[in-house]
Amino acid sequence: MIKNLKQKIKNRFSYSLLSEDDNTDYFSKPCPEDNATLWQRFTFGWTERMLMTGYFNGPLEMKDVSDLPDRNKVNITAPFLDTIDYNSKYPLIKQIYKEFVSRNKISVATKIFVAIVSILSPLCLKYFIYYIKLDESQKTFKFGFLLCVLLFLSSLSLTLSQQYGYWFGLQTSLHARGAITQKIFEKTLRLSNQAKRLYNSGTIMNIISVDVGTFSDFFWNNHIEIFVFPFQILALLILLCWIVGLSGLVGFGVMVVSIPLCTFLSTKIAKNLRISLGYADTRCNLTSEFINGIRFLKLYAWEQLFLDRIEEQRTLQLKYLYRRAIYWILDRMITQVTSALVLVATFSTYALTGNQMTLEVAFTAMTIFVNLRRPLEMLPEAIHRALSLIPSSKRIENFLQSPEIQDQPFLEQYSNNKLSIRNNNNNNNNVSSTSSIASSASSNELFDVKINNGTFDWNEIDDLDSGMIINDVRGFAISSDINDMDEMILGDEKVGKSNDTNNGIEYDGAVQPSSSSYVLNNINFIAPAGKLTVICGIVGSGKTSLVSGLIGEIYRVSGSVNIPNNISFTTQQPFLLSTSLRDNILFGKPMNMERYKKVIDACCLTPDLLQLAAKDLTEIGERGINLSGGQKQRISLARALYSDSDCFILDEPLSAVDPEVASHLFDHCIQGMMKDKTRILVTHQLQFIPSADHIIVVDNGVLTQGTYSELKEKGIDFESIMKTKKLNIDENDQSSTSTTDKKSSTSSSSSELKKSTSLLNSTKELDINTIISEKNDPNLIEKAKLLVKEDRNEGEVGFEVYRQYFRHGSLNLFFLTCALYFISQIIFQLSDFWLTIWTNDETNQHDDKYYILYYCIFIGAFIVFLVVRYFMMASITFAASKKLHSELLNSVAFASCQFFDTNPSGRILNRFSKDISDIDLILMENFSDVLQCGSTVVVALFMMIYITPLISIPFAILVVVYYVIQKLYRASSVELKRMESITRSPVFSLLAEAYNGLVTIRCYQQQKRFIEMMQNHININLRLFFYSFSVHRWVGIRLEFITALIVFFTAFSSLFSSNTGFSVLAVTTALGICSYLNWTIRQMTELEVKMNSVERVESYIKTPREGIRHTSEFEDEIDIDGEIEMDFTKWPSRGEVEFKNVEIKYRPTADPSLKNISFKINAKDHIGVVGRTGAGKSTVGISLFRMVECSKGSIFIDGVDISKVGLHELRDALGIVPQDPFIFSGSIRMNIDPFNKYTDDEIWTALEKVKLKDAISSMPLKLESGVQENGDGLSFGQKQLLCLSRTILKNSKVVLMDEATSGIDYVTAALLKQTIDENFNDCTMLTIAHRLDTIIDSTKIAVIDKGELVEYDTPMNLIKTEGSRFKKLVKYQTDFYEESQKKF
């Protein structure tokens, strides 16, 4: 029968879903609440279809959840926060009350109704007791039954009104949560450089996860209760005085004493929370930097350095969180002890003043106290949350008022062809005004790009006036003539015409310019319309500052800028989204297939698409992690080209590609499809200067501009610069011959290797239609996926998750704590029994003092167990929290690179921010509430059955109904909450990506698109939160009805009981557990939801490690040359490297990136690695560091298979200057020598060799001066110089130079090459380069093509070999330079 009923229900509720096509757009399904009947709205029956689907059809999926009601969508709610008055006190809180709470008056009404019913229900009990005490002759069944119904209705009304209060409060919570998150994201898109130094992506994520969460928690319930509860408490106390007379004032006095204590404790709780959040911000900042720079940390074997820094902040955070927990425990103790002491004080005073304790007095008063308990317990909680809201509000307000980019156009255009500009003139208000950057609307008529009398600085004017700059080091500028490298002074570009470095202002170790010294001072600039303007200059001369001034990314102190409205900009370190290659090129523009194909061809991407599994639909990892540097630059260039703007500003777009590809890009892009447009090219590759219509040389912030002949008259000697680049084959022939004679035994003839023709030439005739399809192929798209879906467990949170959590604390101690909760509740229930015995003592067998004494003993014992259980719970949860974070951090730190390729940083940071925050702040309270409420309900139910066994029959039926309801509920509620947690990750991921690409997003005016993307992500997350809360109310209403029935059956059974006192106790207990039963289920579900955070953290803790970290952990000893043990502190001693049949795949299912590579490098050889961009050169280099493991073959260093060496020892033994240098926040010393291994003299010597000593020595704190995350403000070349100084200092026997000078001008590169030759002469060195002049004198050259080693020999032999690919590259570059010199 039950089986048939189940099948009928399944058919009834699942037929429509079974008939739907899998591709149905469920997001477009309207919210079922919109079309619900009045009864369905009243009972939340409109959620049942979803609940049945989750129970009968398996775990809920996103497609099973309907749309969010329009009233709750963020695009509707966010505009209400546009008019915040920041001049008032607590402006954000006031705005939410004004805009959201005032529109939700029914929420206020329900809270008032709850207060009124809580006063009426004790009166119903009073009259019921009067009836019970009547003689049988005076009782009438109808009147008794009527009183039972009244008790049922009063109980039901009280609990149902609480449920509706929660529901209507949810609307305000959703509005606040969505609107604030959206406003934070919109503000992020407008942050100035100063604001970015104060708020990195980790800080902003922490604000959203913690502070916005505080608003969400407060405004779903506490925002009205904090005002209603005091009046409710006062009304109940008046009623108490009416029942027990002036004795009630004694109880009131106890409460009055407790209120300031609770308020004081709540203040302490908020203070410690505020301090802990500050450390949490720092921890999240460091974690964000750690994740963003993880590959560099692994290459340098610096993981432990950052782990220690993060753990230091974590320890400080936990210190204040533990203090907060102590104050919270004291607050809860005082609250619960007060409720007990009020009973003791009131009843003792009442009895000792000569009054007779009767049933109606004692239990009516007890019911009043039961109704008082919730507001009494929740008022301090509400006050605590309100006080916690203040620091969160302040943090959000500070962020929303942080400085904005000075010249930020709105998306709306005006008829006068000007754009409205948002200009942040002060820190209090964002004022709309018209900027002096004139942006002309797009038209067919081009105009000159100009800067008129422009003065620019990286700091806002307020900072310059006040002299206070926080942690700002803009880098190091080399100040000299273009051929003079002797003079160097501070400031990437942070210098004007003055060379006085002592007029700056010192703060936090950095020298800042005074108001009379700027990055660019009173400059005039012109880029002729429709012409090519080339900007050149040595590293740190001010080129990036000039470009930033053009696009409005640097503070303009004075002057004006005239630039077209629609510009395209490519950064030196390209910004790529974690989406398909195609979407990165389109960048929000509609697809024009004809133009798209031309762009692909012009940017020389066709050969690269051939190598990608899904061609242009291939998913690009975060920051283009699965692409080479050249591929990333060309995709960025393709995006600019496809946008078809009036003006193109290109910052070093050709530095990471080989000469042949660079020429192709220059001819087909810059001089091809961009022809007749205004082009501004920043480049170190001076061979392109002859093609320029206008040239600008930047030197120490000073601009010299004109045509080539005009600049030559001014003393700019381009010819001498070009001579440093020319490849003299004859000289190299001689040097190579000498080298070959010495090492002829190690060379292998190129004739023994495969020959290769130019991949570029071989694809020219290829039909691009075979590569790019106009229709999206689902199979290709699925094949192109790089990011994995976020893990999501199904079903209830398993016992193993709980066991693992308490294993981190103490499992045995937890069981003891559970026992203490039940023991303390039994003791408290015994006090009620004792009170019943007291009131039933009509013969006065004992005086009142006797009963008072034992009543106090029960209450005292309850208090003792209360204190112990709370402190034990705090000890367990804090130990677990500390251990979970530590294990999570270590697991992520030592995970493989593939883990970071397939999981965006925002998703990972979500574990460290929101999930850890839930574990830190909520789990202790959740476990405490569940155990307290659960023990109260269990003990009370057993007591009621013991007193009135008759109710066990209806109880059994209600238990079955209760079981069915909670099974239906939990099957869906947990899944909804899991999906809600998962849908938070895209919010954080988009925020992280947008933050990293702010310059690109703003230049392409893509703010509106990104805002809409964020709105979509937030709405999806709110949608899950909305339905999760809705099913809470569905189960809540049904459980409240069950508890009301329990009251009815208990009261009805009491009509037939002979023991009046215990019958009244049973009814009173039933009334008391009404709210507790529902609160127990709610807290159990909330606990299960929050345990999902533990589940998510545990899933990352189980992440496979990349390999054995220390050699000592290997089971087998390494046998090398007959020796069993090795001293790896001195390995490698020679530097001999050998690749044997090496094959490398980045993913098991991917095609090999390197195929059967075999070659040997003798000790002290310098090997040049060349090849087309994307050919696999960098893969050869990083394979030495085991950043990706060999799928076949082996690599040996000094005869040792590196797969048998611990990763730490291996990477620590090698040196590297990476292609994309990364600078970490901290001091200069920390970035060069993080473990304090070297003396100051050694560090200064290394800095002198890379031409940075003068710059750093001019800083007041010198080596202790600070730099920002990723070296913001340093030019690309300056970062490379710092990385080079690390490697020189390390003095490894094997060194990898991966495009180590790609961001440096040729003069500096020539000097550094001399430095490299001098300092690495005794090392084995692999140099990956596109600049052939940097590797032409190498011992041997390895040519890589399509992942294969196609040539490997001395430069002389390769040049002599007909058809050699290397010879073609050399001849191509040499001919190009000679042709360029002829043009000069």
UniProtKB/Swiss-Prot annotation:
GO terms for molecular function: ABC-type transporter activity; ATP binding; ATP hydrolysis activity; ATPase-coupled transmembrane transporter activity. GO terms for biological process: culmination involved in sorocarp development; transmembrane transport. The keyword Signal does not apply. ATP binds at residues 537-544, 1171-1178. The chain crosses the membrane at residues 112-132, 140-160, 226-246, 247-267, 333-353, 813-833, 852-872, 941-961, 1036-1056, 1061-1081. InterPro entries: AAA+_ATPase (IPR003593), ABC1_TM_dom (IPR011527), ABC1_TM_sf (IPR036640), ABC_transporter-like_ATP-bd (IPR003439), ABC_transporter-like_CS (IPR017871), ABC_transporter_C-like (IPR050173), ABCC_6TM_D1 (IPR044746), ABCC_6TM_D2 (IPR044726). Residues 505-724, 1137-1371 form the ABC transporter domain. Residues 735-756 have a biased composition (Low complexity). Residues 104-388, 814-1093 form the ABC transmembrane type-1 domain. It comes from the Eukaryota. The keyword Repeat applies. It holds the Pfam family ABC_tran. Its main location: membrane. Keywords: ATP-binding, Membrane, Nucleotide-binding, Repeat, Transmembrane, Transmembrane helix, Transport. GO terms for cellular component: membrane. Belongs to the ABC transporter superfamily. ABCC family. Conjugate transporter (TC 3.A.1.208) subfamily. This is ABC transporter C family member 2. It comes from Dictyostelium discoideum (Social amoeba). The gene is abcC2.
